[in-house]
């Protein structure tokens, strides 16, 4: 299906040495024996000296990997493409992901910058049938980050449903593999001074689709929402990918997503950003997770003459969809710069310096005042905490927040149990009446939880009628203020749109 780089199938002990690390031959014995090294954070941040001046030091990572940290800048040849004398550390690390209790490998570059100075971070997603070392071996993103003083992480994106040797590195951006990416990002963000407003994603082929999906599914700044994404011919519509895949890849995708697209459409669509039918046509009103990217700068590249023509079609369909919801999407066509064996489908089509120059101009903005949310799980989307009525089904709604009118609208909701937001975060003023317009598409009714209200309101009116406080669970329009959590809850149960006014 995709160009395979068999020389990059994971062989940790051999490849770690190339990056300046030496792994203990019996990490499990170290784990059983409880031999602790200094933590990575204490080694790299406790001293004012730059990381490139550190000598070999014992490093204990997670619970399963022990390594020796050495400088990669002296000699610079330790990592191809490194800039002599600039400094920095390239590491291959392993953590145990709490949600799955399984190991995740990743490449990390730590810039040689003063301790405590926040720096941007690039998250690079590898392609099909290769590992996290794809970024080191086939791109210059590590040296670009070295030159700019950026952090870089390249996760393995481990697939826990492999169908054979080597297939654990091909997860197609599944929700499970994204849990592993999220764990890696948390690990680095908690241990290093990452600028949360300048985290960027980039990916090629399967990795391009994974980068886009991760961006669309993670819009919480505190969890590492991407400020911008570069998608290089990504697998952005997985039902369409399945229709064009070979038998082995289809078997792997069935294992990952719990069946074929007809049997498990939700699992495919939650890891896609647009929904295409088998003929490559955009599904009207489909489950397009790209709705969540209306204010995120996205640049999509494809190579003219790329042998994976259906992925070029996906790039064009993505551009068409994004043009209807956003002015921040760019489509760039370039001559494919690949070896004959790669069939025009390779990292080499893009210029890493140009990519990073473009990313460098982007900063995560405040969540938009108008937009759509398509949620595949209970999570925070911008300033809104969303809880679904049913798991395994998308929740959706349109929202509009107006500080000048001191109002918020949540309309067209489907499979929505509740939305929670903080009054100050969304820019509403408690000292004036607050208007809420609530309406559902499925007629099920919703609850809005407003935190930080600062005391019970004097009165609340619904459609011109006074509503008395009711903290029961009756199936009636009602409101309740909880002083213990300073939360005002308003529940609308009617299928028609209702206007609520909260008086201070």
Describe each PLM feature range.
Residues 134, 226-290:
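Mobile cap/lid helix-loop segments that gate and shape the active-site cleft of serine hydrolases
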Residues 30-119, 466-470, 476-480:
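A domain-start/cap signature at the N-terminus of enzymes
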Residues 114-119, 124-164, 239, 308:
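Short substrate-entry loop that stabilizes the transition state in hydrolases
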Residues 171-192:
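Alpha/beta-hydrolase active-site loop
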Residues 475-504:
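C-terminal beta-strand-rich structural cap/linker in extracellular carbohydrate-active enzymes
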Residues 130, 189-191, 196-248:
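Primarily recognizes the serine-hydrolase "nucleophile elbow" in alpha/beta-hydrolase
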Residues 299-301, 305-415:
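C-terminal catalytic histidine-bearing segment of alpha/beta-hydrolase fold enzymes
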Residues 414-456:
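Surface-exposed beta-strand/loop patches in extracellular or lumenal glycoproteins
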């Amino acid at each position: 299906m995709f160009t395979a780089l068999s020389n990059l199938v994971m062989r940790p002990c051999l490849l770690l040495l190339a990056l300046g690390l030496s792994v203990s031959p019996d990490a499990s014995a170290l784990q059983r024996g409880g031999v602790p090294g200094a933590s990575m954070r204490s080694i790299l941040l406790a001293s004012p000296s730059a990381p490139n001046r550190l000598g070999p030091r014992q490093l204990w990572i997670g619970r399963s990997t022990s390594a020796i940290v050495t400088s990669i800048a002296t000699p610079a040849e330790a990592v191809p493409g490194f800039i002599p004398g600039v400094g920095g550390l390239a590491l291959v690390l392993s953590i145990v992901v709490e949600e799955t209790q399984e190991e995740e490998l990743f490449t990390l570059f730590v810039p040689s910058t003063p301790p405590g100075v926040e720096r941007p971070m690039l998250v690079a997603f590898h392609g099909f049938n290769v590992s996290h070392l794809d970024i080191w071996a086939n791109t210059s993103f590590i040296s670009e980050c070295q030159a700019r003083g950026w952090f870089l992480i390249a996760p393995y994106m481990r697939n826990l449903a492999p169908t054979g040797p080597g297939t654990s590195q091909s997860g197609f951006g599944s929700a499970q593999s994204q849990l592993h990416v999220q764990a890696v990002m948390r690990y680095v963000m908690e241990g290093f001074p990452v600028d949360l407003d300048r985290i960027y994603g980039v990916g090629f082929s399967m990795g391009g689709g994974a980068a886009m999906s991760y961006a669309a599914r993670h819009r919480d700044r505190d969890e590492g929402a991407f400020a911008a994404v570069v998608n290089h011919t990504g697998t952005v519509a997985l039902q369409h990918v399945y229709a064009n895949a070979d038998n082995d890849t289809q078997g792997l995708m069935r294992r990952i997503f719990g069946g074929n697209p007809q049997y498990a459409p939700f699992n495919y669509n939650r890891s896609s950003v647009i929904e295409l039918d088998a003929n490559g046509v955009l599904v009207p009103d489909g489950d397009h997770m790209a709705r969540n990217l209306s204010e995120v700068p996205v640049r999509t590249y494809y190579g003219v003459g790329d042998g994976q023509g259906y992925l070029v079609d996906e790039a064009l369909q993505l551009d068409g969809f994004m043009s209807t919801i956003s002015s921040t999407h760019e489509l760039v066509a370039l001559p494919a710069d690949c070896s004959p064996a790669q069939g025009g489908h390779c990292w080499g089509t893009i210029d890493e310096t140009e990519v990073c120059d473009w990313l460098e101009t982007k900063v995560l903005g405040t969540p938009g005042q108008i937009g759509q949310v398509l949620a595949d799980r209970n999570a925070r989307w911008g300033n809104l905490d969303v809880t679904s009525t049913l798991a395994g089904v998308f929740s959706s709604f349109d929202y509009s927040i107006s500080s000048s009118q001191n109002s918020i609208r949540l309309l067209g909701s489907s499979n929505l149990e509740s939305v929670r937001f903080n009054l100050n975060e969304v820019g509403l003023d408690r000292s004036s009446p607050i208007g809420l317009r609530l309406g559902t598409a499925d007629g099920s009714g919703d609850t809005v939880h407003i935190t930080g209200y600062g005391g019970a309101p004097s009165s609340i009116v619904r459609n011109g009628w006074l509503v008395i406080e009711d903290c029961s669970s009756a199936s009636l329009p009602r409101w309740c203020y909880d002083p213990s959590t300073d939360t005002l809850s308003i529940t609308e149960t009617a299928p028609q749109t209702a206007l609520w006014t909260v008086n201070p």
